[in-house]
């Protein structure tokens, strides 16, 4: 019998998959060229996961955040190459547009 991943590990796995999938979309569309995996994962953790953790506490908030991150993916992160659902595309576009600052060009 398989034991489910702990919520913290599951969130980290989905966070990485969502970030990788979004970076792939951005690369194809030549958007957010300054974006890094590290900065994107930090934004997802702070903005998306952090919202639910602040609202509902560690245990329930983490479960809700995991459910959201799962919904952002077309399939599980271990089943196929990371790919975002339509909801995932919308949420990540909004996250980047609102919370990730473009570098200043001189």
Curated annotation (Swiss-Prot):
Pfam families: DUF5375. This is Uncharacterized protein ORF106.
């Amino acid at each position: 019998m398989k034991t489910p991943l702990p919520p913290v590990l599951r969130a980290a796995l989905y966070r990485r998959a969502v970030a990788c999938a979004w970076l792939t979309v951005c690369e194809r569309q030549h958007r957010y060229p300054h974006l890094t995996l590290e900065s994107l994962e930090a934004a997802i953790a702070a903005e998306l996961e952090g919202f639910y953790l602040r609202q509902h506490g560690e245990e329930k908030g983490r479960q809700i955040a995991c459910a959201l991150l799962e919904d952002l993916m077309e399939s599980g992160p271990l089943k196929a190459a990371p790919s975002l659902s339509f909801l995932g595309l919308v949420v990540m576009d909004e996250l980047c547009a609102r919370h990730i600052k473009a570098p200043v060009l001189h």
